[in-house]
Amino acid sequence: MTHQMHAYHMVDPSPWPLTGALSALLMTSGLTMWFHYHSVILLLLGLTTNILTMFQWWRDVVREGTFQGHHTPIVQESLRYGMILFITSEVLFFTGFFWAFYHSSLAPTPELGSYWPPVGVYPLNPLEVPLLNTSVLLASGVTITWAHHSLMEGSRKNMLQALLITILLGVYFTLLQMFEYYEASFTISDGIYGSTFFVTTGFHGLHVIIGSTFLLICFIRQLKFHFTSNHHFGFEAAAWYWHFVDVVWLFLYLSIYWWGS
């Protein structure tokens, strides 16, 4: 065994970056096959490979940080910077969608009748399901903060309770969004309004599903006593991500549902 004289974690050789890249190739190729040839076999193979890769890669990270003690304070600081950069990239990702929406809505083209929303499109009422969804996500922001404070104070029971409520609120939000899509009178093919609406809200919904899964993993880990009051970056990263999802929804609600309608 080699002996290191520094606090950094030298990662062991791993096959997961290779299988992750392969799964990305399979998924993108599978999407093309699905769109043009109506075959989902390659897409399902890519999704399966991707899920298996993520599970085993994050399993290794949990082992290294929780059981082997490789996540020293300086490593945790690096992970924090990495998460901040990741969330920053996500902010820019959604900025592109908001830019497309405002570019189209502030100066509607003659093809749209120089009017927004376009003629023939009947927007959703912002005071119905969208307002309920806003309340649900704001409540989940409160409960995830409650969970974080409970963890810092060493109250495991309250932390688990608050985290479970947050996960249930995330699932409830997703179900409401599905109901909203089902009831909408327009589709993604209804011009620029339909495409910007469904792409922006759809990607946000995907982030809610990812965040709910992230929190569910944290819940399972806490059941196994993985987190302490001074060693819980996995949960902290999930909380940051969830707050980011909340803030994006507020901008989305005010821009697309309220002002855009």
Swiss-Prot record:
Keywords: Membrane, Mitochondrion, Mitochondrion inner membrane, Translocase, Transmembrane, Transmembrane helix. Residues 35-40, 106-128, 184-190, 257-261 are mitochondrial intermembrane. Its EC number is 7.1.1.9. The chain crosses the membrane at residues 16-34, 41-66, 73-105, 129-152, 156-183, 191-223, 233-256. It is found in: Mitochondrion inner membrane. Signal peptide: none annotated. It is a multi-pass membrane protein. Residues 1-15, 67-72, 153-155, 224-232 are mitochondrial matrix. GO terms for molecular function: cytochrome-c oxidase activity. The keyword Transmembrane helix applies. InterPro entries: Cyt_c/ubiquinol_Oxase_su3, Cyt_c_oxase_su3_dom, Cyt_c_oxidase-like_su3, Cyt_c_oxidase_su3-like_sf, Cyt_c_oxidase_su3_a-hlx. GO terms for biological process: mitochondrial electron transport, cytochrome c to oxygen; respiratory chain complex IV assembly. It catalyses: 4 Fe(II)-[cytochrome c] + O2 + 8 H(+)(in) = 4 Fe(III)-[cytochrome c] + 2 H2O + 4 H(+)(out). One of its GO terms (cellular component) is respiratory chain complex IV. Component of the cytochrome c oxidase (complex IV, CIV), a multisubunit enzyme composed of 14 subunits. The complex is composed of a catalytic core of 3 subunits MT-CO1, MT-CO2 and MT-CO3, encoded in the mitochondrial DNA, and 11 supernumerary subunits COX4I, COX5A, COX5B, COX6A, COX6B, COX6C, COX7A, COX7B, COX7C, COX8 and NDUFA4, which are encoded in the nuclear genome. Component of the cytochrome c oxidase, the last enzyme in the mitochondrial electron transport chain which drives oxidative phosphorylation. The respiratory chain contains 3 multisubunit complexes succinate dehydrogenase (complex II, CII), ubiquinol-cytochrome c oxidoreductase (cytochrome b-c1 complex, complex III, CIII) and cytochrome c oxidase (complex IV, CIV), that cooperate to transfer electrons derived from NADH and succinate to molecular oxygen, creating an electrochemical gradient over the inner membrane that drives transmembrane transport and the ATP synthase. Belongs to the cytochrome c oxidase subunit 3 family. This is Cytochrome c oxidase subunit 3. It comes from Elephas maximus (Indian elephant). The gene is MT-CO3.
